[in-house]
UniProtKB/Swiss-Prot annotation:
This is Cytochrome f. Its main location: plastid. It comes from Coffea arabica (Arabian coffee). Component of the cytochrome b6-f complex, which mediates electron transfer between photosystem II (PSII) and photosystem I (PSI), cyclic electron flow around PSI, and state transitions. GO terms for molecular function: electron transfer activity; heme binding; iron ion binding. Gene3D superfamilies: 2.40.50.100, Cytochrome f large domain, Single helix bin.
Length: 319
């Protein structure tokens, strides 16, 4: 009886340990996955505001270029490439969260027309798969398959991103029509300057929150500074500078309100662009080809008829 109780106790302890380990794993994985690929997913139902501005610009304050290339027209139920280019100087290094320097990551959001979506793996050709590499795309929301996001990914390798897109078929999707549609893209390189909660990252300028004399500068053990500013009335304010930005002021210096205390370490930025694509009706294409063929045949018959007429005229003149 006692032996059976011991086995029951051991079984209970093992079950608890497995449950706790599983919970820790799930929580850790969730924290990591929720942090990426794009912070905007956490706070915005739609990444494109009514003004046309993509919300990534709220955190990535510097304006940088981005380019998108898509076919001029596609047929229904066809896989095509949408190529997003995020150019930047590969020699640049950014300030990481720990204050050290490292390579820049890139990320992108692609806003497709309703009905367009990420192509399933079995529909993607080997040529496109080779261009995609090991990239993994995801929908912005489970119910928004036409909005795709990716990142952060190493910019050194993926400053050009190929999205495999499947066009819709109006024959099976009644809300889709043969029209010209807009496509919007946003792309960033490097870390943002502001977090979604409004707090600053260490990849931006820090300004003085008061005017006065810099009475004390304490360099923290793990990096960063604690700057004490004393005004003319003897009141003090303390500004905390995280590791990363370079300090521009020194003790005894008089500074003004909102004067930069640090350099701007940001070397990245965000850009957005757009393109247009036509969902082409196959019957319209066939009709166009038939029309062109008939025009060419008419021209040929006209030339032949003209030569025949010239021969008749020449024969009559000789007669």
């Amino acid at each position: 009886m006692e032996t059976r109780n011991i086995f029951s106790w051991i079984k209970e302890q093992i079950t608890r340990s497995i449950s706790v380990s599983l919970m820790i794993y799930i929580i850790t994985r969730t924290a990591v996955s929720n942090a990426y690929p794009i912070f905007a997913q956490q706070g915005y139902e739609n990444p494109r505001e009514a003004t046309g501005r993509i919300v990534c610009a709220n955190c990535h304050l510097a304006n940088k270029p981005v380019d998108i290339e898509v076919p001029q027209a596609v047929l229904p139920d066809t896989v095509f490439e949408a190529v997003v280019r995020i150019p930047y100087d590969k020699q640049l290094k950014q300030v990481l969260a720990n204050g050290k320097k490292g390579g820049l990551n890139v990320g992108a959001v692609l806003i497709l027309p309703e009905g367009f979506e990420l192509a399933p793996p079995d529909r993607i050709s080997p040529e496109i798969k080779e261009k995609i590499g090991n990239l993994s795309f995801q929908s912005y929301r489970p119910n928004k398959k036409n909005i795709l996001v990716i990142g952060p990914i190493p910019g050194q390798k993926y400053s050009e991103i190929t999205f495999p897109i499947l066009s819709p078929d109006p024959a099976t999707k009644k809300d889709v029509h043969f029209l010209k549609y807009p496509i919007y893209v946003g792309g960033n390189r490097g870390r943002g300057q502001i977090y979604p909660d409004g707090s600053k990252s260490n990849n931006t300028v820090y300004n003085a929150t008061g005017a006065g004399i810099v009475s004390k500068i304490i360099r923290k053990e793990k990096g960063g500074y604690e700057i004490t500013i004393t005004d003319t009335d003897g009141r003090q304010v303390v500004d905390i500078i995280p590791p990363g930005p370079e300090l521009l002021v020194s003790e005894g210096e008089y500074i003004k309100l909102d004067q930069p205390l640090t350099s701007n370490p940001n070397v990245g930025g965000f850009g957005q662009g757009d393109a247009e694509i036509v969902l082409q009706d196959p019957l319209r294409v066939q009709g166009l080809l038939f029309f062109l063929a008939s025009v060419i045949l008419a021209q040929i018959f006209l030339v032949l008829k003209k030569k025949q007429f010239e021969k008749v005229q020449l024969a009559e003149m000789n007669f």
